[in-house]
Design a protein with these regions (language model features):
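A short, surface-exposed loop/turn module that caps and links secondary-structure elements
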Residues: 39-66
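Short coil-to-helix segment of the ABC ATPase nucleotide-binding domain corresponding to the Q-loop/switch region
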Residues: 13-14
Length: 94
């Protein structure tokens, strides 16, 4: 587990990167919010802005932060990396 406050490495799944590219072309305000959430996640993965919450059931081990009412940033911590899983829509439990 990372040491609190230590800057993590950032990686993306292909689907998450496609989500991010979507926001680059569609909504700069949402993109700015995602960037702020990621910056905070890199320093404090389990607390901070966006109401971080651990996910359950088949998404156990993943975390979610609110981008807005509809969209979530979903990520996990893998060794010393923050892995972004999604940054568009809601996660799909079950």
């Amino acid at each position: 587990m990372p040491i609190e406050g230590k800057l993590l490495r950032l990686t993306w799944t292909l689907a998450a990167w496609e989500d991010y590219e979507y926001w680059q072309g569609q909504d700069r305000k949402t993109l700015k919010r995602i960037n702020s959430l990621i910056k905070d996640c890199l320093r404090h993965p389990f607390e901070g802005i966006g109401k971080p919450e651990p996910l359950k059931e088949n998404l156990s081990g993943f975390w979610s932060r609110r981008i807005d009412d509809t969209h979530r940033l979903v990520y996990c911590i893998d060794a010393q990396a923050l892995v972004v899983i999604a940054c568009r829509y809601h996660y799909q439990p079950g």
